[in-house]
Amino acid sequence: MLTLDKFEEASEKVKEVTLETKLIYSDFLSDQTGNKVYLKPENMQFTGAYKVRGAYYKISTLTDEERAKGLITASAGNHAQGVAYVVLYGDVYDEACAKAYELAEKEGYTFIHPFDDLAVATGQGTIAMEIFKELPLVEYILVPIGGGGLATGVSTLAKLL
């Protein structure tokens, strides 16, 4: 279950490896929409994406035994960079994911799902902590959706705050 305490814990943890990206006011989008629009440039993270937040927090929640087994994931790109060294497999995500599950089972690796994991979503949701810290009266947060982990984390934390 995603709780405010978990988000606060994750927020402190991901500070070890992430930048607190500052909101940038967009004149163009504000003019186009008639609203004040701010952008959160997570592309400034050292991996080029927010995914390191979820991956790092998830790894921090693993036991020493789980980490010692080795970690494996499947990714369309950015989540894998957040986890570790990458070996590309397959032509599409589903092929990579199937292979990752196969190797996790065969080798005993700990599989870290890129979005279907509460700890990953919690880590990704730390973005909302930073948004509300900088802009406490935010009315709307528009979140891009791929697998849904970022949307899960951000929307859950927004409701909790």
List the predicted regions and their residue ranges.
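PLP-dependent amino-acid enzyme catalytic core
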Residues: 1-161
